[in-house]
Regions:
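Hydrophobic residues in beta-strands and at strand termini
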Residues: 4-6, 40, 57, 100-102
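A short glycine-rich beta-alpha junction/loop motif
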Residues: 45-52, 83-109
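Amphipathic alpha-helical coiled-coil/heptad-repeat segments
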Residues: 102-155
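Short, solvent-exposed alpha-helical surface patches in well-structured domains
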Residues: 64-67, 77, 97, 107-111, ...
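Sequence-specific dsDNA recognition surfaces
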Residues: 1-22
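Short, ligand-facing micro-motifs at secondary-structure edges
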Residues: 1-3, 22-48, 53, 63, ...
Length: 155
């Protein structure tokens, strides 16, 4: 939902996600989506939906937790423990069985800053490559069109 009426927003403080909060989905319709999460780095008001947990803490670096929860090590521990037919749920029991690394706060911040920098560079490279691929796909389509319509002679 992109718009929430003011009346609902007035009573939705418990669902309000603030800058620096970490949101974690406790259910998924597929195994790959188990443990999806996001770190809110914007100042825009965001409201969490049903089957989400907002983690607000100053004792841990929420950005570090978001990176940790996106790691294959953590997600594989979740995926091997969830069960379900149509919906997979992550219970408190499952969470208590998962082993995670929680270094001191200073190290958490150092790790998240390092990952921000490296991931940003990788994202930029991916975006550049996607533009190149889109250009090559257009070039290919243009070539095919020009050849089959006779604008380019092949003999």
């Amino acid at each position: 939902i992109r718009f929430i009426p003011r009346e609902l927003a007035k009573n939705g403080d418990s669902a309000l996600v603030k800058q620096g909060d970490f949101i974690f989905a406790d259910t998924s319709e597929d195994l790959e989506g188990c443990g999806n999460c996001v770190y809110n780095d914007t100042t825009n008001p965001i409201y969490a939906g049903y089957h989400t947990i907002i983690y607000k803490t100053r004792e841990r670096d929420c950005k570090y937790l978001a990176y940790l929860f996106r790691s294959n090590v953590w997600r594989s521990q979740i995926r091997c423990r969830v069960s379900g037919i149509k919906v997979y749920s992550i219970t408190q029991g499952i969470m208590s069985q998962v082993n995670i690394l929680l270094p001191p706060m200073s190290e958490q911040k150092e790790i998240s800053t390092y990952l921000d920098t490296k991931c940003s560079k990788i994202d930029h490279i991916i975006a550049t490559q996607k533009k190149k691929i889109a250009y090559l796909q257009e070039l290919k389509q243009s070539l095919i069109t020009n050849v089959v319509t006779g604008k380019i002679k092949v003999s």
